[in-house]
Amino acid sequence: VLIEVNFQEAFFQNYFIPVAFMSEAELDTNTLIAPAQFNGVSGYLVDALHIEDFRKLLFERIAASAELREFPHIIFHKSSLLGPMKYESSRFMGAEQSNTSIVYNETYVLKIFRRIYISTNPDYEINRFLTEVCRFENTPEYVGSVNLSIGEEDNITIGLMQRLIPNQGDAWNYFLKEMDEVFANLGRKKIKLSDIPDTEHYKRIRLQNIPHQIIDWAGLNLFQKVQQLALRSAQMHVALGSDTRNTSFVPTNFNGDYEVWLKNRLTYQFQNRLNTIENNLHKLEGESMELAKVFLNRKNEIRRRFLDFDWTKLKSERIRIHGDYHLGQVLVDHDDFYLLDFEGEPESTIRDRKVKQPPIKDIAGMFRSFHYAIYSVILNNGSKFPYERDELFVAGEKLYHFICGSFLHTYVDHVQKNNLNIGYTKEIEFLLQYCLLEKAVYELGYELNSRPRWALIPLRGILQILN
Protein backbone atom coordinates (compact mmCIF):
# COMPACT_ATOMS: atom_id res chain seq x y z
CA VAL A 1 0.00 0.00 0.00
CA LEU A 2 1.25 3.48 -0.90
CA ILE A 3 -0.06 6.18 1.41
CA GLU A 4 -0.12 9.93 0.86
CA VAL A 5 -0.14 11.87 4.13
CA ASN A 6 -1.33 15.47 3.87
CA PHE A 7 -0.27 17.94 6.56
CA GLN A 8 -2.05 21.09 7.73
CA GLU A 9 1.05 23.06 6.73
CA ALA A 10 0.13 22.34 3.07
CA PHE A 11 2.71 19.70 2.18
CA PHE A 12 2.50 15.93 1.85
CA GLN A 13 4.68 12.85 2.26
CA ASN A 14 4.42 9.34 0.79
CA TYR A 15 4.83 6.12 2.74
CA PHE A 16 4.96 2.42 1.89
CA ILE A 17 3.39 -0.38 3.94
CA PRO A 18 3.46 -4.02 2.76
CA VAL A 19 0.10 -5.40 3.93
CA ALA A 20 -1.01 -8.99 4.57
CA PHE A 21 -4.10 -10.65 6.04
CA MET A 22 -3.87 -13.00 9.01
CA SER A 23 -6.82 -14.87 10.49
CA GLU A 24 -7.43 -14.60 14.23
CA ALA A 25 -6.26 -18.20 14.62
CA GLU A 26 -2.82 -17.60 13.05
CA LEU A 27 -2.21 -14.10 14.42
CA ASP A 28 1.32 -13.91 15.86
CA THR A 29 2.26 -10.25 15.50
CA ASN A 30 1.19 -7.05 17.24
CA THR A 31 1.68 -4.90 14.12
CA LEU A 32 -2.07 -4.70 13.53
CA ILE A 33 -3.41 -2.19 11.03
CA ALA A 34 -7.15 -2.90 11.04
CA PRO A 35 -9.66 -5.73 11.54
CA ALA A 36 -10.82 -7.30 8.27
CA GLN A 37 -12.77 -10.19 6.75
CA PHE A 38 -11.81 -12.21 3.69
CA ASN A 39 -14.10 -14.95 2.34
CA GLY A 40 -15.96 -15.02 5.64
CA VAL A 41 -12.77 -15.44 7.69
CA SER A 42 -12.21 -12.85 10.44
CA GLY A 43 -8.75 -11.52 11.06
CA TYR A 44 -6.54 -8.48 10.71
CA LEU A 45 -4.55 -6.55 8.17
CA VAL A 46 -0.95 -6.56 9.43
CA ASP A 47 2.47 -5.31 8.40
CA ALA A 48 3.59 -8.13 6.08
CA LEU A 49 7.27 -7.77 6.99
CA HIS A 50 6.47 -9.49 10.29
CA ILE A 51 5.44 -12.66 8.44
CA GLU A 52 8.41 -14.88 7.62
CA ASP A 53 6.77 -16.32 4.48
CA PHE A 54 6.56 -12.79 3.09
CA ARG A 55 10.20 -12.01 3.96
CA LYS A 56 11.19 -15.28 2.27
CA LEU A 57 9.14 -14.35 -0.81
CA LEU A 58 10.95 -11.01 -1.09
CA PHE A 59 14.34 -12.70 -0.84
CA GLU A 60 13.53 -15.36 -3.43
CA ARG A 61 12.13 -12.83 -5.92
CA ILE A 62 15.26 -10.67 -5.62
CA ALA A 63 17.51 -13.75 -5.88
CA ALA A 64 15.73 -14.80 -9.09
CA SER A 65 15.23 -11.26 -10.46
CA ALA A 66 11.69 -12.56 -10.99
CA GLU A 67 8.50 -10.57 -11.29
CA LEU A 68 5.23 -11.35 -9.52
CA ARG A 69 2.72 -12.20 -12.25
CA GLU A 70 -0.07 -10.61 -10.19
CA PHE A 71 1.98 -7.39 -9.89
CA PRO A 72 4.07 -6.89 -13.05
CA HIS A 73 4.89 -3.29 -12.08
CA ILE A 74 7.05 -4.54 -9.17
CA ILE A 75 10.64 -4.83 -10.44
CA PHE A 76 12.95 -7.23 -8.58
CA HIS A 77 16.65 -7.04 -9.43
CA LYS A 78 19.76 -8.97 -8.43
CA SER A 79 23.27 -7.76 -9.17
CA SER A 80 24.96 -9.51 -12.07
CA LEU A 81 28.09 -9.81 -9.90
CA LEU A 82 26.42 -12.35 -7.60
CA GLY A 83 25.93 -16.09 -7.91
CA PRO A 84 22.95 -18.20 -6.72
CA MET A 85 21.35 -17.25 -3.38
CA LYS A 86 19.20 -19.55 -1.22
CA TYR A 87 16.97 -18.45 1.66
CA GLU A 88 17.99 -19.77 5.09
CA SER A 89 16.82 -17.30 7.73
CA SER A 90 15.67 -13.74 8.35
CA ARG A 91 15.48 -11.37 11.32
CA PHE A 92 14.95 -7.68 11.98
CA MET A 93 18.02 -5.55 12.47
CA GLY A 94 15.90 -2.94 14.26
CA ALA A 95 13.52 -0.17 13.25
CA GLU A 96 15.03 3.09 12.06
CA GLN A 97 13.48 6.48 11.34
CA SER A 98 12.69 6.06 7.67
CA ASN A 99 13.34 2.40 6.91
CA THR A 100 13.21 -1.14 8.28
CA SER A 101 16.21 -3.46 7.88
CA ILE A 102 15.97 -7.24 7.57
CA VAL A 103 19.04 -9.48 7.89
CA TYR A 104 18.99 -12.57 5.64
CA ASN A 105 21.20 -15.62 6.21
CA GLU A 106 23.37 -13.39 8.48
CA THR A 107 24.93 -12.29 5.16
CA TYR A 108 22.63 -9.74 3.51
CA VAL A 109 20.61 -6.74 4.67
CA LEU A 110 17.38 -5.69 2.92
CA LYS A 111 16.50 -2.09 3.69
CA ILE A 112 12.78 -1.42 3.20
CA PHE A 113 12.14 2.28 2.70
CA ARG A 114 9.07 3.39 4.66
CA ARG A 115 9.20 7.02 3.53
CA ILE A 116 9.22 6.92 -0.26
CA TYR A 117 9.60 9.36 -3.13
CA ILE A 118 8.22 9.40 -6.66
CA SER A 119 11.71 8.69 -7.96
CA THR A 120 14.49 6.19 -7.48
CA ASN A 121 16.16 6.56 -4.09
CA PRO A 122 19.69 8.09 -4.19
CA ASP A 123 20.87 5.36 -1.80
CA TYR A 124 19.92 2.74 -4.40
CA GLU A 125 21.38 4.71 -7.32
CA ILE A 126 24.74 5.46 -5.70
CA ASN A 127 25.18 2.07 -4.02
CA ARG A 128 24.53 0.22 -7.28
CA PHE A 129 26.83 2.58 -9.19
CA LEU A 130 29.68 2.22 -6.69
CA THR A 131 29.37 -1.58 -6.71
CA GLU A 132 28.63 -2.48 -10.33
CA VAL A 133 30.41 0.33 -12.20
CA CYS A 134 33.23 1.43 -9.90
CA ARG A 135 33.87 -1.78 -7.91
CA PHE A 136 34.34 0.47 -4.86
CA GLU A 137 35.01 -1.93 -1.98
CA ASN A 138 34.50 0.30 1.07
CA THR A 139 30.72 0.45 0.93
CA PRO A 140 28.25 -2.40 1.51
CA GLU A 141 28.13 -4.33 -1.78
CA TYR A 142 24.93 -3.88 -3.81
CA VAL A 143 23.05 -7.20 -3.93
CA GLY A 144 19.62 -6.34 -5.29
CA SER A 145 16.58 -4.08 -5.11
CA VAL A 146 12.82 -3.73 -5.34
CA ASN A 147 11.32 -0.86 -7.35
CA LEU A 148 7.78 0.04 -8.34
CA SER A 149 7.27 1.13 -11.94
CA ILE A 150 4.65 3.89 -12.11
CA GLY A 151 5.23 5.18 -15.62
CA GLU A 152 7.59 5.05 -18.57
CA GLU A 153 10.44 6.68 -16.64
CA ASP A 154 9.41 6.95 -12.97
CA ASN A 155 10.36 4.23 -10.51
CA ILE A 156 9.84 4.23 -6.74
CA THR A 157 12.54 2.44 -4.74
CA ILE A 158 11.01 0.44 -1.89
CA GLY A 159 13.86 -1.97 -1.11
CA LEU A 160 17.67 -2.10 -1.28
CA MET A 161 19.60 -5.29 -0.48
CA GLN A 162 23.29 -5.08 0.43
CA ARG A 163 25.94 -7.38 1.79
CA LEU A 164 26.20 -7.25 5.59
CA ILE A 165 29.44 -5.63 6.79
CA PRO A 166 30.86 -7.24 9.96
CA ASN A 167 31.67 -4.27 12.16
CA GLN A 168 32.42 -2.96 15.63
CA GLY A 169 29.88 -0.12 15.42
CA ASP A 170 29.84 3.26 13.73
CA ALA A 171 32.62 5.84 13.56
CA TRP A 172 30.65 8.28 15.73
CA ASN A 173 30.84 5.99 18.77
CA TYR A 174 34.40 4.99 17.90
CA PHE A 175 35.64 8.59 17.85
CA LEU A 176 33.60 9.50 20.95
CA LYS A 177 35.60 6.88 22.87
CA GLU A 178 38.82 8.15 21.31
CA MET A 179 38.01 11.76 22.27
CA ASP A 180 37.13 10.72 25.81
CA GLU A 181 40.57 9.12 26.13
CA VAL A 182 42.22 12.18 24.62
CA PHE A 183 40.65 14.52 27.18
CA ALA A 184 41.38 12.08 30.00
CA ASN A 185 45.05 12.27 28.93
CA LEU A 186 45.10 15.97 29.83
CA GLY A 187 44.84 15.17 33.52
CA ARG A 188 46.61 11.82 33.33
CA LYS A 189 49.69 13.37 31.72
CA LYS A 190 49.36 16.65 33.66
CA ILE A 191 49.38 18.64 30.42
CA LYS A 192 49.51 22.40 30.78
CA LEU A 193 46.83 23.67 28.40
CA SER A 194 48.73 26.84 27.54
CA ASP A 195 51.55 24.64 26.19
CA ILE A 196 49.31 22.96 23.59
CA PRO A 197 50.27 24.35 20.16
CA ASP A 198 47.74 25.40 17.53
CA THR A 199 47.68 25.50 13.75
CA GLU A 200 45.91 27.60 11.17
CA HIS A 201 42.44 26.27 10.40
CA TYR A 202 42.10 24.49 7.00
CA LYS A 203 45.90 24.32 6.69
CA ARG A 204 46.88 20.91 5.31
CA ILE A 205 49.39 19.17 7.53
CA ARG A 206 51.36 15.94 7.10
CA LEU A 207 51.34 13.41 9.92
CA GLN A 208 55.09 13.84 10.50
CA ASN A 209 54.62 17.61 10.82
CA ILE A 210 52.06 17.47 13.62
CA PRO A 211 53.84 18.84 16.75
CA HIS A 212 55.03 16.18 19.18
CA GLN A 213 53.00 17.83 21.97
CA ILE A 214 49.80 17.05 20.03
CA ILE A 215 50.87 13.46 19.32
CA ASP A 216 51.90 12.95 22.96
CA TRP A 217 48.50 14.23 24.08
CA ALA A 218 46.08 12.76 21.51
CA GLY A 219 48.07 9.72 20.39
CA LEU A 220 49.33 8.64 16.97
CA ASN A 221 46.43 6.19 16.50
CA LEU A 222 43.83 8.98 16.41
CA PHE A 223 45.51 10.72 13.49
CA GLN A 224 46.18 7.45 11.65
CA LYS A 225 42.45 6.69 11.83
CA VAL A 226 41.60 10.23 10.67
CA GLN A 227 43.89 9.76 7.68
CA GLN A 228 42.39 6.36 6.86
CA LEU A 229 38.90 7.87 6.88
CA ALA A 230 40.16 10.73 4.70
CA LEU A 231 41.58 8.21 2.22
CA ARG A 232 38.29 6.27 2.01
CA SER A 233 36.40 9.57 1.58
CA ALA A 234 38.72 10.56 -1.26
CA GLN A 235 38.38 7.16 -2.93
CA MET A 236 34.57 7.45 -2.71
CA HIS A 237 34.64 10.84 -4.45
CA VAL A 238 37.11 9.69 -7.11
CA ALA A 239 34.76 6.77 -7.85
CA LEU A 240 31.66 8.99 -7.95
CA GLY A 241 33.44 11.37 -10.33
CA SER A 242 34.89 8.71 -12.63
CA ASP A 243 32.04 8.09 -15.07
CA THR A 244 32.01 9.61 -18.55
CA ARG A 245 28.79 8.08 -19.96
CA ASN A 246 26.01 7.98 -17.36
CA THR A 247 24.62 11.53 -17.28
CA SER A 248 23.47 11.02 -13.67
CA PHE A 249 27.12 10.70 -12.63
CA VAL A 250 29.26 12.55 -15.20
CA PRO A 251 31.07 15.49 -13.47
CA THR A 252 29.84 18.93 -14.46
CA ASN A 253 30.99 22.53 -14.10
CA PHE A 254 29.46 25.24 -11.95
CA ASN A 255 26.95 27.42 -13.83
CA GLY A 256 24.36 30.13 -13.34
CA ASP A 257 21.49 27.68 -12.83
CA TYR A 258 23.34 26.03 -9.95
CA GLU A 259 24.13 29.40 -8.37
CA VAL A 260 20.47 30.49 -8.48
CA TRP A 261 19.33 27.12 -7.07
CA LEU A 262 21.93 27.25 -4.28
CA LYS A 263 21.19 30.82 -3.19
CA ASN A 264 17.42 30.30 -3.22
CA ARG A 265 17.78 27.15 -1.16
CA LEU A 266 20.18 28.59 1.41
CA THR A 267 18.44 31.93 1.89
CA TYR A 268 15.16 30.06 2.48
CA GLN A 269 16.87 27.72 4.94
CA PHE A 270 18.60 30.63 6.68
CA GLN A 271 15.33 32.54 7.11
CA ASN A 272 13.78 29.38 8.54
CA ARG A 273 16.63 29.16 11.09
CA LEU A 274 16.23 32.84 12.00
CA ASN A 275 12.55 32.24 12.74
CA THR A 276 13.41 29.13 14.76
CA ILE A 277 16.03 30.87 16.89
CA GLU A 278 13.73 33.84 17.57
CA ASN A 279 10.93 31.48 18.62
CA ASN A 280 13.21 29.37 20.83
CA LEU A 281 15.44 32.03 22.36
CA HIS A 282 13.73 31.55 25.73
CA LYS A 283 15.00 27.93 25.85
CA LEU A 284 18.64 29.03 25.77
CA GLU A 285 20.84 30.13 28.65
CA GLY A 286 24.40 31.14 29.42
CA GLU A 287 26.85 31.06 26.52
CA SER A 288 24.23 29.63 24.15
CA MET A 289 22.01 32.65 24.76
CA GLU A 290 24.94 35.06 24.25
CA LEU A 291 26.02 33.37 20.99
CA ALA A 292 22.42 33.26 19.74
CA LYS A 293 22.17 37.02 20.20
CA VAL A 294 25.46 37.49 18.32
CA PHE A 295 24.05 35.26 15.56
CA LEU A 296 20.95 37.46 15.31
CA ASN A 297 23.03 40.65 15.36
CA ARG A 298 25.18 39.34 12.52
CA LYS A 299 22.36 37.86 10.45
CA ASN A 300 22.93 40.27 7.55
CA GLU A 301 26.61 39.31 7.43
CA ILE A 302 25.71 35.61 7.35
CA ARG A 303 23.15 36.21 4.59
CA ARG A 304 25.80 38.09 2.58
CA ARG A 305 28.15 35.12 2.99
CA PHE A 306 25.56 32.85 1.41
CA LEU A 307 24.93 35.33 -1.41
CA ASP A 308 28.69 35.74 -1.99
CA PHE A 309 28.84 32.81 -4.42
CA ASP A 310 30.05 33.61 -7.92
CA TRP A 311 30.15 30.52 -10.13
CA THR A 312 32.33 32.29 -12.73
CA LYS A 313 35.25 32.29 -10.26
CA LEU A 314 35.09 28.53 -9.67
CA LYS A 315 37.13 26.17 -11.85
CA SER A 316 36.42 22.89 -10.05
CA GLU A 317 33.71 20.36 -10.91
CA ARG A 318 30.54 19.14 -9.27
CA ILE A 319 29.73 15.44 -8.83
CA ARG A 320 27.13 13.25 -7.15
CA ILE A 321 28.11 13.19 -3.49
CA HIS A 322 27.06 11.39 -0.32
CA GLY A 323 25.02 14.41 0.75
CA ASP A 324 24.65 13.62 4.47
CA TYR A 325 28.20 12.62 5.31
CA HIS A 326 29.10 12.35 8.99
CA LEU A 327 30.64 9.88 11.42
CA GLY A 328 27.31 8.12 11.98
CA GLN A 329 27.25 7.11 8.29
CA VAL A 330 30.52 5.19 8.58
CA LEU A 331 31.04 1.66 9.92
CA VAL A 332 34.27 0.64 11.67
CA ASP A 333 35.73 -2.77 10.85
CA HIS A 334 38.98 -3.15 12.78
CA ASP A 335 41.38 -0.66 11.14
CA ASP A 336 39.15 0.24 8.20
CA PHE A 337 36.01 2.23 7.41
CA TYR A 338 32.94 1.47 5.28
CA LEU A 339 30.74 4.29 3.97
CA LEU A 340 26.98 3.86 3.77
CA ASP A 341 23.51 5.48 3.67
CA PHE A 342 23.58 7.64 0.54
CA GLU A 343 19.99 8.91 0.88
CA GLY A 344 21.07 12.54 1.33
CA GLU A 345 19.89 15.29 3.70
CA PRO A 346 16.54 14.36 5.29
CA GLU A 347 15.17 17.91 4.92
CA SER A 348 15.94 18.10 1.18
CA THR A 349 13.57 17.15 -1.62
CA ILE A 350 14.45 14.05 -3.62
CA ARG A 351 15.28 16.26 -6.60
CA ASP A 352 17.66 18.43 -4.56
CA ARG A 353 19.43 15.35 -3.19
CA LYS A 354 20.40 14.35 -6.74
CA VAL A 355 21.88 17.74 -7.68
CA LYS A 356 25.62 17.48 -8.32
CA GLN A 357 27.57 19.30 -5.62
CA PRO A 358 31.20 20.17 -4.82
CA PRO A 359 32.70 17.09 -3.13
CA ILE A 360 34.11 19.42 -0.48
CA LYS A 361 30.55 19.66 0.87
CA ASP A 362 30.86 16.08 2.14
CA ILE A 363 34.18 16.95 3.80
CA ALA A 364 32.54 19.92 5.51
CA GLY A 365 29.92 17.54 6.88
CA MET A 366 32.61 15.25 8.26
CA PHE A 367 34.48 18.17 9.84
CA ARG A 368 31.29 19.32 11.55
CA SER A 369 30.88 15.76 12.84
CA PHE A 370 34.40 15.80 14.36
CA HIS A 371 33.54 19.17 15.94
CA TYR A 372 30.43 17.58 17.44
CA ALA A 373 32.38 14.59 18.77
CA ILE A 374 34.83 16.87 20.60
CA TYR A 375 32.13 19.10 22.05
CA SER A 376 29.80 16.28 23.05
CA VAL A 377 32.57 14.72 25.17
CA ILE A 378 33.12 18.07 26.91
CA LEU A 379 29.39 18.76 27.39
CA ASN A 380 28.55 15.24 28.61
CA ASN A 381 31.71 14.25 30.49
CA GLY A 382 33.53 17.53 31.15
CA SER A 383 33.06 17.34 34.92
CA LYS A 384 35.37 14.33 35.17
CA PHE A 385 38.32 16.25 33.69
CA PRO A 386 40.30 18.52 36.10
CA TYR A 387 39.86 21.67 33.99
CA GLU A 388 37.29 24.40 33.52
CA ARG A 389 34.86 23.89 30.64
CA ASP A 390 36.16 26.94 28.76
CA GLU A 391 39.72 25.58 29.02
CA LEU A 392 38.53 22.28 27.53
CA PHE A 393 36.82 24.16 24.70
CA VAL A 394 40.10 25.93 23.85
CA ALA A 395 42.02 22.63 23.89
CA GLY A 396 39.26 20.98 21.85
CA GLU A 397 39.42 23.68 19.16
CA LYS A 398 43.17 23.17 18.82
CA LEU A 399 42.69 19.41 18.47
CA TYR A 400 39.95 20.04 15.90
CA HIS A 401 42.30 22.20 13.80
CA PHE A 402 44.91 19.43 13.66
CA ILE A 403 42.29 16.76 12.86
CA CYS A 404 40.95 18.87 9.96
CA GLY A 405 44.47 19.67 8.71
CA SER A 406 45.53 16.03 8.80
CA PHE A 407 42.32 14.86 7.11
CA LEU A 408 42.54 17.56 4.45
CA HIS A 409 46.15 16.73 3.55
CA THR A 410 45.37 13.05 2.90
CA TYR A 411 42.10 13.80 1.11
CA VAL A 412 43.39 16.52 -1.24
CA ASP A 413 46.57 14.58 -2.01
CA HIS A 414 44.60 11.50 -3.12
CA VAL A 415 41.88 13.22 -5.18
CA GLN A 416 44.39 15.41 -7.01
CA LYS A 417 46.63 12.44 -7.82
CA ASN A 418 43.55 10.74 -9.29
CA ASN A 419 42.50 13.76 -11.38
CA LEU A 420 39.30 14.70 -9.56
CA ASN A 421 39.02 18.44 -10.07
CA ILE A 422 38.26 20.01 -6.66
CA GLY A 423 40.11 23.26 -7.47
CA TYR A 424 43.30 24.81 -6.13
CA THR A 425 43.96 25.86 -2.54
CA LYS A 426 42.00 29.15 -2.49
CA GLU A 427 38.97 27.58 -4.14
CA ILE A 428 39.08 24.59 -1.78
CA GLU A 429 39.20 26.92 1.23
CA PHE A 430 36.35 29.09 -0.09
CA LEU A 431 34.10 26.09 -0.76
CA LEU A 432 35.03 24.50 2.57
CA GLN A 433 34.14 27.61 4.58
CA TYR A 434 30.96 28.14 2.54
CA CYS A 435 29.82 24.54 3.07
CA LEU A 436 30.82 24.55 6.76
CA LEU A 437 28.62 27.60 7.30
CA GLU A 438 25.75 25.92 5.44
CA LYS A 439 26.13 22.76 7.53
CA ALA A 440 26.33 24.61 10.86
CA VAL A 441 23.23 26.71 10.06
CA TYR A 442 21.41 23.49 9.07
CA GLU A 443 22.41 21.88 12.41
CA LEU A 444 21.23 24.91 14.38
CA GLY A 445 17.60 24.35 13.40
CA TYR A 446 17.76 20.70 14.44
CA GLU A 447 19.30 21.45 17.82
CA LEU A 448 16.91 24.29 18.67
CA ASN A 449 13.93 22.06 17.93
CA SER A 450 15.13 18.89 19.65
CA ARG A 451 17.89 19.59 22.22
CA PRO A 452 18.49 23.31 22.86
CA ARG A 453 21.43 22.64 25.21
CA TRP A 454 23.41 21.44 22.19
CA ALA A 455 22.71 24.59 20.14
CA LEU A 456 26.03 25.79 21.58
CA ILE A 457 27.91 23.50 19.15
CA PRO A 458 26.60 24.86 15.81
CA LEU A 459 26.54 28.41 17.20
CA ARG A 460 30.25 28.16 18.08
CA GLY A 461 30.89 26.65 14.66
CA ILE A 462 29.08 29.48 12.86
CA LEU A 463 30.94 32.22 14.74
CA GLN A 464 34.25 30.42 14.25
CA ILE A 465 33.70 30.57 10.47
CA LEU A 466 32.60 34.23 10.56
CA ASN A 467 35.66 35.18 12.60
Per-region residue spans from a language model:
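Conserved ATP-binding subdomain of kinase catalytic cores across diverse folds
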Residues: 4-279, 327-329, 333-418, 424-425
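An alpha-helical support segment within catalytic cores of ATP-dependent transferases
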Residues: 80-88, 273-319
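Charge-rich, acidic-biased intrinsically disordered regions
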Residues: 248-267, 289-292, 296, 422-436, ...
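Short, motif-level signal for alpha-helix interfacial/capping segments enriched in acidic residues
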Residues: 301-305, 420, 425-426
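Conserved catalytic-loop position in the HRD/HxD motif
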Residues: 324
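ATP/Mg2+ or Mg2+-diphosphate-binding catalytic cores
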Residues: 394-420, 430-467
